Swiss-Prot record:
This is Small ribosomal subunit protein uS13. Part of the 30S ribosomal subunit. Forms a loose heterodimer with protein S19. Forms two bridges to the 50S subunit in the 70S ribosome. It comes from Rickettsia massiliae (strain Mtu5). PROSITE patterns: RIBOSOMAL_S13_1 (PS00646), RIBOSOMAL_S13_2 (PS50159). HAMAP family: Ribosomal_uS13 (MF_01315). Transmembrane segments: none annotated.
Length: 125
């Protein structure tokens, strides 16, 4: 397995697909990186030469925020919003959907498991 941006990428897959295993690189960015490195997108990772791997590493490390740096930036942005107590920050604090989604009947993933409410006590007539 080749190692790029401290991630082991699979050898048997095409280069474009393998690059998407790196956090922060989707299919579009992976194709863009292949074009910059002048490497065919359909080439398998195990067919790459050492020089091609080095050029891929250099392009990714110099031009893109990936893996730890990107995760750190995202968490710092969320923390900053929480600190200034803007609307999105408050939604993060309350563990509710941030981007305007409805919460009346949905948002179970974000809110957590449903909490049962005790039923009304039946009175004997």
């Amino acid at each position: 397995m080749a190692r790029i941006a401290s991630v082991n990428i699979p050898d048997s897959k095409r280069l474009v697909v393998s690059l998407t295993y790196i956090y922060g690189l989707g299919p579009t960015m992976a194709a863009e990186i292949c074009n910059k490195a002048k490497i065919s997108k359909d080439k398998k990772v195990k067919e790459l030469t050492d020089q091609e791997l080095i050029s891929l590493r250099n392009i990714i490390e110099s031009e893109y925020k990936v893996e730890g740096d990107l995760r750190r930036e995202v968490t710092l942005n969320i923390k900053k919003k929480k600190d200034i107590r803007c609307y999105q920050g408050l939604r993060h604090i309350r563990k509710l959907p941030v981007r305007g989604q409805n919460t009346h009947s949905n948002a179970r993933t974000r809110k957590g498991k449903a909490i049962a409410i005790a039923g009304k006590k039946k009175t004997v007539k």
